[in-house]
Design a protein with these regions (language model features):
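Active-site C-terminal subdomain of aminotransferase-like
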Residues: 22-106, 110
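Conserved PLP phosphate-binding loop immediately N-terminal to the Schiff-base lysine helix
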Residues: 1-14, 18
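Short coil/turn connectors at secondary-structure junctions
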Residues: 10-12, 26-29, 149, 161
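Fold-independent oxyanion-binding glycine-rich loops
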Residues: 1, 18-20, 27, 34-36, ...
Length: 170
């Protein structure tokens, strides 16, 4: 529900997402799309599996059995969010996300800050990474924004922790 993504058309082998990714839901459901090629490769893989095997899950789906209690509240929420997305229209949603993303990037540029993106024009329509000037702790900026404006910004991940923050604009 966030970006135009075409698993089959683009020849992607495995796509994994979650209910919190553009579907207006809290975390709790995982969505998996697996190509025939990936399923076949999985059948011949020699690496042991501690948790997940595609073929076992596909067999369980055929019978309606699932190895755990599903989060029915999220499934009802998913049904509603999908109705809302289809009512607005996916092309309209994608265009809205692009507009909001560009507005966010324009604000960041107006603040005189650097946008964390390797290639200009390849920005994400769902979040903007904002680099802090040298000597400014991004996590302290996040804390100030949260305390003063009740806005939660994402932290920098890995080597970028403390150097940047992330603004989600879905």
């Amino acid at each position: 529900g966030s970006v135009d993504y075409r698993h089959d058309e683009w020849g992607v082998d495995v796509t994994i997402s979650g209910s919190q990714k553009g579907l207006m839901l809290p975390p709790g459901i995982s969505f998996n799309a697996v190509s025939t090629k990936a399923l076949e490769a999985s059948k011949h893989a020699s690496m042991g599996r501690a948790f997940w095997a595609w073929d076992e899950i596909i067999e369980m789906n055929k019978t309606g059995y699932w190895p755990y209690t599903p989060n029915t509240n999220l499934l009802y929420g998913l049904s509603e969010s999908l109705d809302m997305l289809l009512e607005e229209g996916l092309d309209n949603i994608f265009a809205r996300h692009e507009r909001l993303a560009e507005a966010c990037r324009a604000a960041v540029r107006a603040w005189g800050l650097e946008i964390q993106c390797v290639e200009d024009g390849r920005h994400s329509p769902v979040l903007t990474g904002v680099m802090m000037p040298e000597g400014v702790d991004a996590d302290q900026v996040r804390k100030l924004i949260y305390e003063n404006f009740n806005m939660s910004l994402g932290t920098g991940l890995g080597k970028l922790k403390g150097l940047m923050f992330r603004i989600g604009h879905l």
